[in-house]
Each structure stands twice: as C-alpha cells, then as structure tokens.
Amino acid sequence: MSIYSDKQQSRVAVNPKTGEPYKTGKKVQEWLESSPEGVEYITLEESARIAEMNFAIRNHEYASVLLSDGDPEIVLRQSMYGVECQSKMDYLKPVGRQLIDHKTTQSLDTFPDWIERKYLFQMAFYRMMIKGITGHTWNVSLVAIEKEPPYEIGIWELTDDSLIEATADVIAQLQYYRYCRDKDIWPGKYPEVNRI
C-alpha cells in the first residue's frame, strides 16, 4: 500500500463526461461550491507530482518495505498523565512494531538538523501514545522525500537515546497542562514583561 495511493488521486476534480480534470470557469466554480465540505482539490500538475513521488517511494529499496503491510493515517486516543490526548500517525506497521512518519522537504541536506530541532518532541509523543495502548515500545522511522525531481528519499531511524530528552519534555508539558487546567491558571509562555 502506498502513502498516496488512490485516496490522494480521488481528490482530483475530474469531469465525468470527459474523464479529464476540470478547467477553471463558471461551471467549475458552480461545481466547487456544490462539492461536499472537506474535499480538497489539486491541480493536474500536483497530481502528476504526487504520482512521481509515489513511484519514487515504491521503487526505493527501503522506503517501499517500510511503507508496506501496515496501516496509514491511524488516529489514537488515550489519557496520558491525566490529559486526554489524540494523535494521527502516518503509518503503523504492526510487524516489527514500526511507527513510520512521512515528510516532504525541500532538501534532505538540512533534514537531520530539522529533526533535532522540531521533530523529536512529536515522535516522542507518538511513541508514548502507542506504548500506552499496546504496552510495547515501538521503533520510530522517518521517511522523507524531496518535493522536486529527482525526488531524493532519505530514511532515518530514531534511537531510544535520541528520544529520551524529548520524552521527558512531553511528560513535563502534559503535567504542566494538567496543572494549569486543574487550577484554571493559564499564564502562557511569557506572563511577565520582558526586557531586551
């Protein structure tokens, strides 16, 4: 199963009479206004790019294996540290207990720095969620693909050591949120006047 598969392709606005994507104009505007809420539309160029990225992933030695025999877009809900939590994970692969997140990026060259700055917290949160539900610690992998040809792909495995500090941060934030909620005190990040 592909991360993009038929679900993404079904978002393209296609004229049922011609089988071709709609062009802009009065009829298209009427059709858009009558479409169900939550339907997203993409251009023909975007559809082609998605197909090319999908092809790259399916033909990548490791990404194709990681993103097969699992379940995409899984929503988990549970209480952690007295806080009701929800997360939507890109891909769960029960065999081997793999939690796989998929990202697009402009450049893989800067992606490892981005992981360290912004991504470990989210992955630690996801891993805590799934461990709370299954009772097992899952492996975390990231599959990143560049947004432009040749659609370079990189895969990173996050080690237990890389997630220790982020997990402690998640726990601290959940406990702080619960304290604020229970006391009905919401100071924000900068409650005092700051001087520079």
Model-predicted segments: where are they?
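Short histidine-centered catalytic/ligand-binding loop motif
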Residues: 38-42, 109-118, 159
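Hydrophobic/aromatic-lined pockets within catalytic cores
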Residues: 3-4, 104-107, 131-134, 178
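Metal-dependent nuclease catalytic regions and adjoining charged, substrate-binding loops involved
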Residues: 115-117, 125-196
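Metal-dependent nuclease catalytic cores that hydrolyze phosphodiester bonds in DNA/RNA
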Residues: 1-88, 191-195
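Conserved catalytic cores of phosphodiester-cleaving nucleases, focusing on short active-site segments
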Residues: 87-112, 126
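Secondary-structure boundary elements
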Residues: 62-68, 93-99, 130-138
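Glycine- and acidic-residue-rich phosphate-binding/metal-coordinating active-site segment common to enzymes
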Residues: 122
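Coil-to-beta-strand transition motifs
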Residues: 82-86, 93-97, 137-138, 148-151
